[in-house]
């Protein structure tokens, strides 16, 4: 019995001891799992089967508690492991530092953008004004090549050919360039300021306006054309009335300027024909020559006024095109230059026919460049001025051109007796002037 009870007691003690050993090993196994979990990113190695008396098993105990603490810390902040979280914190700090650096760069870039904008405005003005001076100076230089010096019998045939070319250019400019662009303001002169504004305005024109508004716009263009014709007629009638009382007192003076304006050869011929010229000057037909010369001078100044307004609209177009971009500005400049060369030659012929010398006519033509410069400046200073100005300036100028071509230039071609070949040359010159405007309008 005693032996049996002792054996039973030993068995119970053995069972208790084995349970404690199993519990401790299970606890150490769970802790090792936690340590391994804590060291999954740190790279530390744990001995999974170590006993509690092993020094190797007891050494990482503090590290395990430290890493478990880190694990709890990371769980509170970012639900991540301590090492990964601390690395993420450093990364975030570096990112914040980079953000401040970018902010500093943004301030520097804004200053550079402002300075670049100022430089771009200076370049814009230089390009636009330079293009305007180019379209004014190039035709002026071409006038030196024209052999006509003044309104004399020696150059009369060539002058009539140039006048025919001028009438064709004026009529073609009015009906193929000015009036169509006044009817469709977004085609050339009011291409303004940016592609967005063009698209907006085009959309408003196509969808927002009714047929009644379009009809009213066409009516207004037609009225402005008629207004230009009537205005030029009124100005010429008014000047005739002012000069009408002085026609008899200055009956001999117009012939003197013609002799001064002529070449030296004409002066020599005038001296040889001294008596014949005096007899002719005393006859009654001189009154008609005086009246025609005074009328032609008035029409010459009217042509200058029309040319001034036309150059103003060209300046508006150049300024608006350079606001869009340098490439658009260059194309517009070339187009206007091709258009201005024949136009200026015709205006020069009209001024010479009105009694001006070649030098005076060239100087007056050069003064009209002020209108182009004024138009360019207005277009650059106020971007929306192009639409408002071309709404009435273009058709009004077209009316002036029609009046000058039909009332002033064409009657000069019908005056006097011309040979068949001379008349053919005049008609061909007129058609050539119209044809040049057709080509320019086609490729514009």
UniProtKB/Swiss-Prot annotation:
GO terms for molecular function: zinc ion transmembrane transporter activity. It is a multi-pass membrane protein. Disruption phenotype: Morpholino knockdown of slc39a7 protein causes neurodevelopmental impairments, decreased head size, smaller eyes, shorter palates, and shorter and curved spinal cords, as well as a reduction in intracellular Zn(2+) content in the brain. These morpholino elicited phenotypes can be rescued with Zn(2+) supplementation. Residues 61-93, 103-112, 185-208, 267-279 have a biased composition (Basic and acidic residues). InterPro entries: ZIP. The keyword Transferase does not apply. Residues 38-50 have a biased composition (Basic residues). The keyword Transferase does not apply. Its main location: endoplasmic reticulum. Keywords: Endoplasmic reticulum, Golgi apparatus, Ion transport, Membrane, Transmembrane, Transmembrane helix, Transport, Zinc, Zinc transport. Residues 24-112, 185-214, 245-292 are annotated as: Disordered. The chain crosses the membrane at residues 3-23, 128-148, 161-181, 215-235, 318-338. It catalyses: Zn(2+)(in) = Zn(2+)(out). GO terms for cellular component: endoplasmic reticulum membrane; Golgi apparatus. GO terms for biological process: B cell differentiation; intracellular zinc ion homeostasis; regulation of ferroptosis; skin epidermis development; zinc ion transmembrane transport; zinc ion transport. Disulfide bonds: none annotated. Highly expressed in brain and eye of adult zebrafish. It is found in: Endoplasmic reticulum membrane; Golgi apparatus, cis-Golgi network membrane. PANTHER family: ZINC TRANSPORTER SLC39A7, ZINC TRANSPORTER SLC39A7 HISTIDINE-RICH MEMBRANE PROTEIN KE4. Transports Zn(2+) from the endoplasmic reticulum (ER)/Golgi apparatus to the cytosol, playing an essential role in the regulation of cytosolic zinc levels. Plays a role in maintaining zinc homeostasis and organism development especially in eyes, brain, and gills. Homodimer. This is Zinc transporter Slc39a7.
